[in-house]
Swiss-Prot record:
A GO molecular-function annotation: ATP binding
Assembly and binders: Acetyl-CoA carboxylase is a heterohexamer composed of biotin carboxyl carrier protein (AccB), biotin carboxylase (AccC) and two subunits each of ACCase subunit alpha (AccA) and ACCase subunit beta (AccD).
Alphabetically ordered keywords of this record: ATP-binding, Cytoplasm, Fatty acid biosynthesis, Fatty acid metabolism, Lipid biosynthesis, Lipid metabolism, Nucleotide-binding, Transferase
Protein name, UniProt field: Acetyl-coenzyme A carboxylase carboxyl transferase subunit alpha
Pathway: Lipid metabolism; malonyl-CoA biosynthesis; malonyl-CoA from acetyl-CoA: step 1/1
Pfam families: ACCA (PF03255)
SUPFAM superfamilies referenced in this protein's UniProt entry, alphabetically: ClpP/crotonase (SSF52096)
Role played: Component of the acetyl coenzyme A carboxylase (ACC) complex. First, biotin carboxylase catalyzes the carboxylation of biotin on its carrier protein (BCCP) and then the CO(2) group is transferred by the carboxyltransferase to acetyl-CoA to form malonyl-CoA.
Annotated family: Belongs to the AccA family.
Residue intervals of the CoA carboxyltransferase C-terminal domain: 37-292
InterPro entries: Acetyl_CoA_COase_a_su, ClpP/crotonase-like_dom_sf, COA_CT_C
A GO-annotated cellular component: acetyl-CoA carboxylase complex
GO biological process, one term: malonyl-CoA biosynthetic process
Amino acid sequence: MEYLDFELPIKELLEQLDKCQIIGTESNVDVTETCKQISQKLEDTKKDIYGNLTAWQRVQLSRHPSRPYTLEHITNLTKGTFLELFGDRNFKDDKAMIGGLGKIGDQSFMFVGQQKGINTKMRQFRNFGMPNPEGYRKALRLMKMAEKFNIPVVTLIDTPGAFPGIEAEERGQGEAIARNILEMARLKVPIICVIIGEGASGGALGIGVGDRVLMMENTWYSVISPESCSSILWKSWEYKEQAAEALKLTSADMKRQKIVDDIIPEPLGGAHYDKATAFKTVEEYILKAFNELKDLSTTDLVAQRMDKYSKMGEYNE
């Protein structure tokens, strides 16, 4: 397990507990009470740290290398029924954007999401979860296919942003994202969006328009990353903590501002500490959202979605 800087007290206590247990196993010394005290201190420390996370610390947790990515979520949600689909039928298949059909229980869904890599080689293969225009066009192709066959859509969002390279701009990155936003706003099937990691800027918005937008507890959603914001305002990444607070990018901030509809709770310490529980909770929230939407007529579904987004950004003096 890799520990973040603010988790070091937990790491130290775990090491102490391991040493205590080894001493008890390898000698005749009774260390039961000592181990019990360390365990209690460990639990108290975890509650204190994870119960008082700053915005920047939640950003760090959203990027934890052990945190489950999109494919892992889909695999656990669909229990072996996932059939991946490829290509945008215009340019090529973008490995940073994945999608396909799968079932949760007896209900079919079209899944779409950004995929990061689990190691250096895979991160390069997946372009670090930064889709090109063909990725967003593939996502739209699959969503339009879902509309044709009346299949609800689930998007899993985890990206540091759309790929900013010149070749992406030449192929119409801005147009691809804008087109997705337009088409998702009027898609005639339920759309459930789940932010499972990073939700950065237009890269997230390109698959982020839905009837229900859910955020996992330790994720973020913003027009810009804290580091980039800091580099623009202060010409340095040193102020990323202040930028994270100012951006109001946490799940609690987004719920308060009515940008997202619900927060999916995570196990203590983050989704990577207990993946099975995290997967189960995500499944429950997806099905809950779908059950709220499935009986709506197409007209009411689209009208409610448009009304929801029309109300965002209201300002009262």
